Amino acid sequence: NAGQIDLKDRINEKKSSNQPFIIVFVGINGTGKTTSLAKVANMLKNEKFSVVIAAADTYRAGAIEQLREHTNRLNLKIIAQNYGSDPAAVAKDAVLYAQSHKVDCVLVDTAGRMQTSSNLMEQIAKITKVVNPDMKIFVGDSLAGNDTVNQAREFHKQVKFDCSILTKSDADARGGAALSIVKVTSSPIIYVGVGQEYDDIVKF
């Protein structure tokens, strides 16, 4: 049984100990990871949680600007440094900011590609070691079928994520990749992305 996850409950639980709830998003480039992060941020904001976002993909050209565009539209605080800077340090900065400003949630964007797959996994492992997230979410493209299942398997082996978001989907996409991901990772899919707008994210 992959179990169920109630994000709101978990955040409130952490909030009662006066600590921010930290979510790290993982997945390869092109899957809609950054957009999914923005959708989750918007959802949390609508639930009246305060949110800060860490631009810890310091590898891909344009990644920081893309995230900044989302945070500008959503009127959210972003913590960013320069390209090539240590992503774990960026994530840590965001957590420190959240602690000192009593922010409820820290959402961390991470790289989806580096020189090698092992570089990428090491980097994500370092981020998780430094910030000790409450939740790691894998983002996969529902249209990529087996590729997505293989990515999920690989990421899960290396970084043990807690749950997944499937993008480019529709609310009825309960078959195929979704079932396989749940099976190979023994972890639930919590949301599916069903469109381009910030509200286009639904519980699975």
Residue ranges of model-derived segments:
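Short low-complexity stretches enriched in small and charged residues
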Residues: 31-35, 61-64, 119-122, 146-147
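Conserved catalytic-core segment of NTP-binding enzymes
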Residues: 86-100, 115-204
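Acidic active-site catalytic centers that drive phospho-/nucleotidyl reactions
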Residues: 33, 57, 109, 141, ...
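Primarily NTPase-proximal linker/entry elements flanking Walker-type ATP/GTP-binding cores
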Residues: 1-56, 63-83, 91-99, 104-108
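Short glycine-rich anion-binding loops that position phosphate/pyrophosphate groups of nucleotides
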Residues: 111-113
